[in-house]
C-alpha cells in the first residue's frame, strides 16, 4: 500500500463497505453485498504475522476501529501484542471513528463538542496496552476518495506509518517523524477532530500523539511518543526506531557467525562487521558513543 506517498512493508486489515460498482461495459450497476468483518476474522488474519521469519513487516497498521469500543480495543491490542512479541516492527493504532464522528454510513459528521471527542478518545486509547512497539494518534482526516467519487473520513494511523517510512527514506530512522518538516499529513481537506492546546497537552500525557491542523502550515503530527505508559528512553518514537534499526543489523551480523568456532578470530570478525556500522550511525547523529 502507499503510505502518505511512500511505500512501506505493512499490513492493513479493516472492514468492507457496500459500494456501487460499474460493470466493465458501463451498461448497468450493481451493489456489492455486505461482508461484515468480525473481530475474530481480523485476529485470525493478524495471527499469520506472528511468524517473524515467514512474514517480515515494518508496520502493522490498525486502520479503522470496530463497531464497539470493546472490539476496537481488542483489535488495537492484538496488533500491539504482535509487534511487542516480534520486536522488529511498530503497531500504529488510533481511536474509533465513533469517538470523533456521529452518524453512520457514508456521511458521518464530527461531534460538535471537542471536549466530548477528547473524552471519547481517552476512554478508548487508555485501554490500549503499554508498549514501546506501538504508536497512538488522535486523527481522522477528510479526503476525496477518487475511486468512489466522494468525500469520506479515514483514520490517520496509516499516515503516521507513512511519516516513519518517509523519514527513513529522506533522513534516518532515528529522526522524529513528527513536526512541520517530517510530520505533514498529505491529501487531507480537514480533520474530524482538531484539538486545542489544552486538549493536546491532555492527550500527550496519555501517550496519544495529537494530529493538528495549524493555519498556514497544514495538518501535522504534533507528538512523537510511543505507547509506553511510563517514563523511559523508549517512550519516544525515534529512540525505538533507532534500536529497531541497530538491533536488526547486529542480529544479522551475529546470525552470519552461527556454527563458527568460538575463538578470537570469529569474535574479531564479528567486531569488524559491527563497528563500522555503529560508526556510521554515530556519524549520522543516531548515537553519541558505543
Predicted features and spans:
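Structured, hydrophobic secondary-structure cores that serve as assembly/anchoring elements
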Residues: 2-290
